[in-house]
Regions:
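Helix-to-loop junction immediately C-terminal to a conserved catalytic motif
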Residues: 68
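Conserved ABC ATPase "signature" region
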Residues: 83-84, 131-149
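Conserved ABC ATPase signature
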Residues: 154-158, 162
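Conserved catalytic motifs of ABC-family nucleotide-binding domains
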Residues: 175
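Catalytic Walker B motif of ABC-type/P-loop ATPase nucleotide-binding domains
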Residues: 179-182
Length: 277
């Protein structure tokens, strides 16, 4: 005979699914009367990577700025692990920003500080580490992003791709639960874009980060995404698994994928456009 399950086991079995770490619900925002996002909903579970796709100007980065509290929605709810953030004061948002960090397009590094000092900055701000511990963590983070050869260099001397790698290291120094990436492959060559994609994927696998990546680069998204949010004219045209997005017959999605299938030659000249392999 089988033993009857205990009350504790029944409770675990019947427990509700884990609440998403990020939950956008019917969010709208307009600038100067012009709708930017309209009734947009999506969620991200812990450890997942969401890629937000769409053409320029459809509000992809606006969603990240609302998550950070830099913008407030006109309507809708934004919840972080069940906590509504749209009504939080700036002080309340500072606590949220200890758990969620953002890697900006320009890296947002301090120009007057070396790579080492940039990565050390958030560690020193914590105030609970001695200098030996700070330097040990800095070396570990710089090694993680492959920037060991530029530790004493100022950001102005770095390429765009290197700046973003260092910005990721500095973001990780804050020990966040969620990392937001705003167009990480813009203005970098395909080799650097692949390196950044490998880095973001490795961080997910090793450290279990939850990530949201805003990008227009479908190749990049294919390598990273568990979930896809596709924005068209400010609305969520698709939200769901990557496989479903790739198979969608929505005409706007098919057009986006078709245009992305073409790449310019590496050098200008008479070479024709070539399709993605």
């Amino acid at each position: 005979m089988f033993d009857s399950p205990s009350n504790e086991e029944l409770s675990r079995t019947l427990a509700e699914p884990e609440e998403p770490i990020i939950d956008f619900s019917h969010v709208s925002i307009a600038f100067d009367g012009r709708p930017v996002l309209e009734d947009v909903s999506f969620y991200v579970n812990r450890g997942q990577t969401l890629c937000i796709l769409g053409r320029s100007g459809v509000g992809k980065s606006v969603a990240l700025r609302m998550l950070m509290g830099f913008l407030k929605p006109d309507e809708g709810s934004i919840r972080i692990e069940g906590q509504e953030i749209t009504t939080l004061s700036e002080e309340g948002m500072r606590a949220i920003r200890k758990r969620i960090t953002m890697v900006f397009q320009n890296g947002a590094l301090f120009d007057s500080l070396s790579v080492r000092e940039n990565v050390a900055f958030p560690l020193r701000e914590r105030g609970d580490l001695n200098e030996e511990q700070v330097q040990e963590l800095v070396d570990r983070l710089i090694g993680l992003v492959g920037a060991e050869d530029v530790v004493d260099v100022l950001p102005s001397s770095l390429s765009t791709g290197r700046k973003r790698a260092v910005a990721i290291a500095r973001a990780l120094a804050a020990q966040p639960e969620v990392v937001l990436y705003d167009e990480p492959t813009t203005m970098v060559d395909p080799i650097i874009a692949r390196h950044l994609g490998d880095l973001i994927q490795r961080l997910k696998q090793k450290l279990g980060f939850t990530s949201i990546v805003v990008t227009h680069d479908m190749r990049f998204a294919e390598r990273l995404a568990d979930l896809v949010l596709f924005l068209h004219q400010g609305r969520a045209q698709f939200f769901g698994p990557l496989k479903g997005f790739m198979a969608s017959q929505d005409p706007h999605i098919r057009q986006f994928l078709a245009l992305d299938a073409y790449v310019l030659p590496s050098e200008l000249g008479d070479s024709p456009l070539v399709t993605r392999a």
